[in-house]
Structures are given as C-alpha cells and as structure tokens.
C-alpha cells in the first residue's frame, strides 16, 4: 500500500 496511491485516490 503506497501512501500516494491512497492519498490521490482517496482510499479512506
């Protein structure tokens, strides 16, 4: 899980 992946895709 990459931080950038979750950040820009808003996977909250």
Swiss-Prot record:
Record-annotated membrane-spanning stretches: none
Top-level taxon of origin: Eukaryota
GO annotation, cellular component aspect: extracellular region
Gene Ontology molecular-function annotations: hormone activity
Entry keywords, A to Z: Disulfide bond, Hormone, Secreted
Places the protein is found: Secreted
InterPro entries xref list: Urotensin_II
Protein task: Has a suggested role in osmoregulation and as a corticotropin-releasing factor. Probably involved in smooth muscle stimulation.
Protein name: Urotensin-2
Source organism (scientific name): Scyliorhinus canicula
